[in-house]
Amino acid sequence: MTPKLIVALDFDNQDNALQLVDKLDPNHCALKVGSELFTLLGPQFVKELVRREFKVFLDLKFHDIPNTVAKACHSAAELGVWMINVHAIGGLRMLQAARESLKTYGKDRPLLIAVTVLTSFEEGELASVGISNTLPEQATHLAMLAREAGLDGVVSSAHEVKIIKQKCGENFITVTPGIRLPNNLKDDQSRVMTPQQAIREGSDFLVIGRPITQASNPHEVVSALLRDL
């Protein structure tokens, strides 16, 4: 069974990242590699995590012309990752091209999910980039576009999960960042929830970074989270 917990490796160097990885169990959590760490360490670091039998979510949020995104998704799949993502705002043709690029992998292909609205966005900010929808409206609209394109699911704030499930179906995967423990500050995330709240809303996978990576005892935090989930 795939763990519900995805630990975000938000580090700026390999030593610190691997020190945390050494304390984690691939049976208990997946790992997320984002733009900072991938830019610094590249594909070899991802391959090392896969070699250690972790499921890896490669969080690079591809957004470009359809052909470029398709090739990027194919290259990501070659690394053996479990999940990759693209920006839903790239449009239907881009999403379809990304999906088609993974067909050759058959049942071994990575999950392909789309980013709806970043959890750092606050109500009203969409208008500054020319979008008149509210946050829930925009997230739901993009989720439905991703479903139409044949993607497996979306990245979405827990606040939008329930309506996305209603519109796109219970089997449509929701990956939820912006998860904070009750005693944590929001940091630069605006729309946050605790793990228990997010699961109640219907989130399938929870992405948790700083509450684990900045903890004095990360293993203890992970164990407590798993007990709660």
Curated annotation (Swiss-Prot):
Plastid listed as a keyword: no
Class in the EC hierarchy, top level: lyase
Pathway: Pyrimidine metabolism; UMP biosynthesis via de novo pathway; UMP from orotate: step 2/2
Swiss-Prot/TrEMBL keywords: Decarboxylase, Lyase, Pyrimidine biosynthesis
Single biological process term from Gene Ontology: 'de novo' pyrimidine nucleobase biosynthetic process
Primary role: Catalyzes the decarboxylation of orotidine 5'-monophosphate (OMP) to uridine 5'-monophosphate (UMP).
Name the record gives this protein: Orotidine 5'-phosphate decarboxylase
The organism of origin for this protein: Legionella pneumophila (strain Paris)
